[in-house]
């Protein structure tokens, strides 16, 4: 149960940079304040959104590489018999999951207040707990399942997950663009 919950919760935040602002957003609504500041400058919505996507991709690539390399080195039993290509497929499936959930986080961060963003984060956490519990009661492991999928379909699994996750980002971008045009930042 714990390992599934850990992965379902931790992997999506590998693409986030944590600093003082990210821990106080629910109190001082720092994301909204930052957006209001950016709106006073000649910066397009597309540039703001692209900046946020870049702020997701770079930490996700760095943190994901570290996370999955360490996991590969220290969890030998789980990955016994996997080729490097299969393990990369496994890691890419999880990174796709991270991008998928990050689409929800980014949409909430850019279009809602800090308190609503905190609420969305809590709801996603509860969903992760529920998913991990359901898997535990069903005697299914999300980790083992993704390992098996990567073993059986090392090319197809990450392609499908990439398509789904980038579709989620695209939908999120459309929603953010639409909402930013009318969002009251005061």
Question: Where do the model's predicted regions map?
Answer:
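Hydrophobic alpha-helical transmembrane segments of membrane proteins
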Residues: 1-33, 51-186
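Alpha-helix N-cap/helix-start motif at helix boundaries, enriched for small hydrophobics
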Residues: 47-49
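Short helix-to-coil transition segments within interhelical loops
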Residues: 39-45
């Amino acid at each position: 149960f714990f390992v599934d919950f850990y992965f379902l919760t931790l992997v999506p935040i590998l693409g986030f940079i944590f600093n003082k602002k990210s821990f106080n957003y629910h109190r001082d609504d720092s994301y909204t304040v930052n957006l209001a500041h950016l709106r006073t400058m000649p910066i397009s919505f597309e540039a703001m959104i692209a900046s946020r996507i870049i702020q997701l991709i770079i930490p996700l690539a760095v943190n994901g590489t570290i996370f999955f390399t360490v996991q590969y080195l220290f969890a030998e039993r789980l990955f016994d018999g996997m080729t490097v290509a299969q393990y990369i497929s496994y890691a890419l499936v999880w990174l796709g999951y991270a991008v998928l959930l990050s689409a929800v986080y980014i949409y909430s961060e850019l279009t809602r207040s800090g308190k609503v963003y905190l609420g969305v984060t809590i709801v996603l956490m509860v969903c992760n707990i529920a998913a991990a519990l359901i898997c535990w009661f069903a005697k299914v492991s999300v980790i083992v399942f993704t390992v098996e999928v990567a073993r059986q379909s090392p090319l197809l699994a990450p392609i499908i997950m990439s398509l789904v996750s980038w579709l989620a980002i695209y939908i999120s971008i459309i929603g953010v663009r639409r909402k930013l045009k009318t969002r009251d930042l005061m």
